């Protein structure tokens, strides 16, 4: 497996999770912090943090801190996937 194939496989694994896709859809609307994501999607804060970490590690998300030291997550890039079989 080439490096490009491995990266694509990892990205597809990350995006294969429904909750991560829901988080991405929510962040398309506006930047959000963990509690906001948790409440809007009815997912535990711990699960949200785990999903956000994976998305951040894949460079799909970024974050910024506000004055209250809350992390606001946002999409780094618009995501579009095309599959050719």
Segments (PLM) and residue ranges:
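Beta-hairpin "wing" of winged helix-turn-helix
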Residues: 57-67
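Short, Lys/Arg-enriched N-terminal segment that forms or immediately precedes the first helix
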Residues: 1-12
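Short capping segments at the starts of secondary-structure elements
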Residues: 18-20, 29-35
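A short acidic, leucine-rich amphipathic alpha-helix
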Residues: 23, 36-40
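Key DNA-contact positions within bacterial/archaeal DNA-binding proteins
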Residues: 46
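Residues within the DNA-recognition helix of helix-turn-helix
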Residues: 51
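Conserved segment of winged-helix/HTH DNA-binding domains
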Residues: 12, 69-85
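Alpha-helical residues within the helix-turn-helix
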Residues: 39, 56-57
């Amino acid at each position: 497996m080439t490096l490009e194939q491995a990266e694509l496989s990892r990205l597809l694994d990350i995006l294969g999770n429904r909750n991560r896709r829901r988080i991405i859809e929510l962040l398309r609307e506006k930047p959000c912090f963990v509690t906001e994501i948790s409440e809007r999607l009815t997912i535990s804060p711990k699960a949200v943090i785990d999903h956000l970490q994976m998305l951040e590690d894949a460079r799909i998300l970024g974050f910024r801190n506000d004055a209250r030291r809350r992390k606001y997550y946002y999409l780094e890039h618009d995501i579009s996937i095309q599959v050719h079989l």
